[in-house]
């Protein structure tokens, strides 16, 4: 059985540190992609009293959040009109991505006789989603003056927040500051938000009314310098499994598909029941490490859909069937941390964690 163990104390402490850092800004907690692989239900249940908003990528994720909490939920993605009636009934916040969205929303709101909460997503330079920068002011004004729309927020997203010196940051910040000025002239109550985790860590001046600390709450820090208080943030989860079988190799034996790993006579190999079918990175096969009783062991051979193997050498530490295996550590410097695993396979921690699927149990402790 594979379990992602989540520390409620660490989760709570991370939010507390961020809260102190951003001052009066609200916290909108992104829990998209199954809370970056940590489990929407488990994370929302244990944080809804600590944050002001939640954010998700789509309607179906939003419904999972509203089943647990009455806190506002913002959907970042496009509007799926087949789900809009339920979204409106549950007061889920919709993102306007184009000026024409307003007319469609007004028509549906009239039919339902219920106002729709919206946040206008502004394309300040990322060029992925959002209202065109040159079309923003009329979109804001139209939404603000609508009888059927409640303009709750205006936001954008930084394309290069992980690189503080990238020139795109200055361009986007300048554009968004102009938008904020326009929106606030209409109403001081409009919530303006720009910064994800790396955004406000790189520039504390752009917290505005709300920040969106996703990866930071889950415990992953940027590689650029941050203040000492932020360095107290820790990963909230460990991925654990157990040894289910130990095999002794004979001379010439290989392990796993294609026999890419060849052991030595008498070598012990442990079988762990987790594989790429669980969302564990296949690229780590024959490259990654696991921790058994505070000893690091290398993976041996290709990872399969449902299992991986590790070399115990001569098994000097007497690893046994049933021993706990730590696959992902909550200590960043460990070779099996999400941070160093990501480095090994040329990806990011978000990718390592968010691909873990529902074959893995989530447990908050």
From Swiss-Prot:
UniProt xrefs under SMART domains: Ala_racemase_C
Catalytic residues (UniProt): 32, 257
Residue numbers carrying N6-(pyridoxal phosphate)lysine: 32
Enzyme class, first EC level, given as a word: isomerase
Keywords assigned: Isomerase, Pyridoxal phosphate
EC number: 5.1.1.1
Superkingdom of the organism of origin: Bacteria
Gene Ontology molecular function terms on file: alanine racemase activity; pyridoxal phosphate binding
GO biological process, one term: D-alanine biosynthetic process
Job of this protein: Catalyzes the interconversion of L-alanine and D-alanine. May also act on other amino acids.
PANTHER family tied to this protein: ALANINE RACEMASE, ALANINE RACEMASE, CATABOLIC-RELATED
Listed name of the protein: Alanine racemase
């Amino acid at each position: 059985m594979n379990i992602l163990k989540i520390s409620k104390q660490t989760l709570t402490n991370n939010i507390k540190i961020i809260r102190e850092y951003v001052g009066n800004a609200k916290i909108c907690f992104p829990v998209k992609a199954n809370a970056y692989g940590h489990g929407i239900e488990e994370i929302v249940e244990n944080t809804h009293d600590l944050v002001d908003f939640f954010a998700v990528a789509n309607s179906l994720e939003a419904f999972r959040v509203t089943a647990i909490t009455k806190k506002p939920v913002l959907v970042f993605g496009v509007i799926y009109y087949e789900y809009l009636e339920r979204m409106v009934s549950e007061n889920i916040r919709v993102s306007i991505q184009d000026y024409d969205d307003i007319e469609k929303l007004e028509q549906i709101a009239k039919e339902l006789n219920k106002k729709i909460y919206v946040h206008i997503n502004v394309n300040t330079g990322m060029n992925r989603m959002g209202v065109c920068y040159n079309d923003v002011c009329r979109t804001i004004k139209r939404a603000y003056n609508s009888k059927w729309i409640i303009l709750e927020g205006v936001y954008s997203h930084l394309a290069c927040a992980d690189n503080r010196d990238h020139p795109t940051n200055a361009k986007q910040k300048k554009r968004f500051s102009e938008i904020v000025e326009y929106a606030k002239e209409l109403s001081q109550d409009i919530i303006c938000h720009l910064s994800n985790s790396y955004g406000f860590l790189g520039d504390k001046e752009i917290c505005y009314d709300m920040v969106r600390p996703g990866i930071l709450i889950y415990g992953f820090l940027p590689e650029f310098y941050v203040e000492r208080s932020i360095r107290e943030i820790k990963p909230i989860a460990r991925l654990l499994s157990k040894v289910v079988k130990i095999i002794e190799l004979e001379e010439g034996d290989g392990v796993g598909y294609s026999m890419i790993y060849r052991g030595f006579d008498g070598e012990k190999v442990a079988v762990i029941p987790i594989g790429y079918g669980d969302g564990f990175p296949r690229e780590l096969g024959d490259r990654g490490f696991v921790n058994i009783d505070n000893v690091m062991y290398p993976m041996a051979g290709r990872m399969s859909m449902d299992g991986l193997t590790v070399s115990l050498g001569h098994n000097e530490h007497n690893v046994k069937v049933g021993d706990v295996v730590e696959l992902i550590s909550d200590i960043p410097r460990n070779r099996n941390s999400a941070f160093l695993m990501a480095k090994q396979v040329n990806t990011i921690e978000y990718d390592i964690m968010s691909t873990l699927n529902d074959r893995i149990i989530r447990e908050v402790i």
